[in-house]
Amino acid sequence: MNTIAPALKQIASGLRFPEGPVAMDDGSVILVEIERQTLSRVTPDGKVQVIATLGGGPNGAAMGPGGKIYVTNNGGLKFMVRPGKMFPIGQADDYTRGSIQIVEPLTGKFETLYDACDGQRLRGPNDLVFDRAGGFWFTDLGKTRDRDMDRGAVYYAKADGSMIREAIFPLERPNGIGLSPDERTLYVVETPTARCWAFRLSAPGQIESAKSVFRGDRGTLVAGLGGYQMFDSLAVDGEGHVCVATPITGAVTDVWPDGSRVDQYKLPDMMVTNVCFGGRALRTAFATLSMGGTLVSFEWPRPGLALNHLNKK
C-alpha cells in the first residue's frame, strides 16, 4: 500500500459533523451537518449557509431529478462533544425512524419520500447514488444502541416515490455506495469490516447472482483493509477506482477496480467520512473531516466520475 500526503486546501471550518458533500458547478459544495441536523451550502470563500433544517440525522446527499437534493436521514445520532472535536456514540434519545427526504435547494422546502419498505421501518439510511434509469440505490446502516445494533441492508427505489424494495440483506453496517462507470457493478462498503464488495447488475436495480465463499448473494470481495480501520462513504472516479473515506486511519482509500492495488491519501482528522469530485475536469477531491468539522480539497490523480443529474452530459 502506498501512502500519500496530499497538499490540502481548507475550505470551511466550524461545521457540525459534516458529511455527504456534493460539488456544484458554481464552485459551492452542498453537504449535510449531522449534529446540526441541516443541509448546508459552503461557498467557495468558506461561508456556510443553511439550506434546510431537516431534523433527525441527515447523513448523505445527492443531486436528483429536477434539481432537487435527495437526503438519506439516519433518524438522529447522539454525539460526544469535546473542545474542537465531536463524534457519534449511538442512537439519539429522540430517534423514531430513518427516511429519504427531498429538498428544494432554492427554497429549503422538503418532504419525506420513503420511511419504510414492505412494512419495515427504515433504520438508518446512510449513503445513496442515482443510476441513469431514474432510480437510486441507498444503504441502511442501521442504528447502534448500548447493548445491540441493527443489521444493515441495501435498497433500490424510484425517485418519484412509486417503488422501494430491499435488494441486499444482511450486511455488516453498509455505508458507502457507488456505481461503476458503465453502471454494471454496484459497490458497497461495510464500516466495521472495512471491506469493499462488488455486485454485478443484470439490469437497473437488479443484482445478478454471484458465487462467493461467504455468501452467494453478497457479491465479490474487491478489497479489505487490515488492522483497525473502518470504511465510510465513497465516490467512484472516472477510471472506476473506488475512493473510500476511511475513519480511524484518517484517509481516503483508493481501491483499484480489480482490487489489485490500494493507496491511501492521509488527511489530518481520524474521522474522514466522505469524498466527492468537482472543479475543473472533476480533478478536485472534496473531503469531509467530521471530527474537527472541516471541509478540505486536494488534487486527485484522475478525473472523478460524472454523476447522473449533476454533471453528466
Q: How would you describe each model-predicted region?
A:
Residues 1-313:
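Sequence-structural signature of mature extracellular/luminal beta-sheet repeat domains
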